[in-house]
Amino acid sequence: MQGHPAPPRRRRRGRGVLTGLLVFGLVVSGVVVAGRWVADGARSLPFLARCEASVGDRSVSVTPEQAQHAATIAAVAEQRGLPARAVTIALATAYQESKILNLDYGDRDSLGLFQQRPSQGWGTPEQVRDPTYAAGRFYDELVKVPGYTEMPVTEAAQAVQRSAFPSAYADHESDARVLASALTGWSPASLSCAVTPSGFSAEVQDESGFTPRAAGVAAELRSWFGDDTPISTYQTAGGRSTHDRGLALDVFFPMEDGAGGREGWAAAHWLVANA
């Protein structure tokens, strides 16, 4: 891509990819959306092998690394209050520039998910290879484009990237739409990941009822979706639940204003992608 000078700005929340966690289920009611996670140290824990987003009659398959980066791109937009259209544009761009991979190489000095060039004012090499920073810098420039939400995806992407191949982003629009719809929560229960066993040692829960890994999930989720996100270890499934051993969490998003459902699914899909 060509450079687009702008003063670098770092906006980062979250502390890295979650490990040792398994999505157990998602419950939707008229009151809350609850995402339940299991972090069971007594047996082998999962490692993602493949993820699939399905919306309508279209499905998109991505690797765990791609899913994690796509989820970060969507979560940064969520933090900034940007629409799903912005996420679609960003994902189409990342597909074209890097295949949604955090590359340590590129044309001239281009690096990272969006192949941003440090020499052109996008940030330091370390910054543009930070997915959270890179997504934020992309959105910094996207929101400066007048009417970007009404423009064709490829034109909006090109207005930011100034690529030598301005129409190439259109090739990825359909896949980007599917991922964006799932990761922004507009398409409920639309992201799943296949897993294979990976060993983790057992952990002891603390006085709050959390194991260290479960506490890490709670902190990570709140860093992205709000410090006031209610997270509980309350046991709701009788003897079948693992809440009483600190191995499961319930995450609640209130539904009063109608937004909780979408936000809840956005958080749930982020958790799936980052398991």
Please give the residue ranges for each predicted region.
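Non-catalytic cell-wall polysaccharide-engagement segments
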Residues: 1-54, 125-227
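Active-site-adjacent loops and short helices of periplasmic peptidoglycan-processing enzymes
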Residues: 41-161
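Generic preference for hydrophobic/aromatic residues in regular secondary structure cores
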Residues: 114, 191-193, 249
